[in-house]
Amino acid sequence: IMAYSPCINHGIKAGMGKSQEETRLAVASGYWPLYRYNPALKAEGKNPFILDSKAPDGTLREFLRGEVRYAALEKTFPEEAKRLHDRLEQEILEHYEHLKRLADPMSICEEAQDKELPVGKTA
């Protein structure tokens, strides 16, 4: 089991009593996607990878600002923090799309069919 476990060193601004809310924000923002892998499903002919998370909801910055370890960067180096947060947001979206493809391998085939080149053309 891999889990997001807020701790005192994260510096949750709302306090450790709000760690469940912080965890919810981590998941909703896409910072910590929820998924399961059950190899026993493979023997049943099923996909062993199950994505439980919904698409990131755009609350990444809210999540990051709620923890001192991330908020300190924004306070000290706002331009660099913005650049890094923008990059992280993009990477989270790309990672979520990757997880969606793992959860639905047929979508990979459909994407490939959509991108097929006309007869006689090569990439």
Where do the PLM segments sit?
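Low-complexity, highly charged intrinsically disordered N-terminal segments
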Residues: 28-30, 89, 96, 101-103, ...
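Glycine/aspartate-rich loop-and-adjacent alpha/beta segment that forms the canonical ThDP
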Residues: 2-83, 87, 100, 116, ...
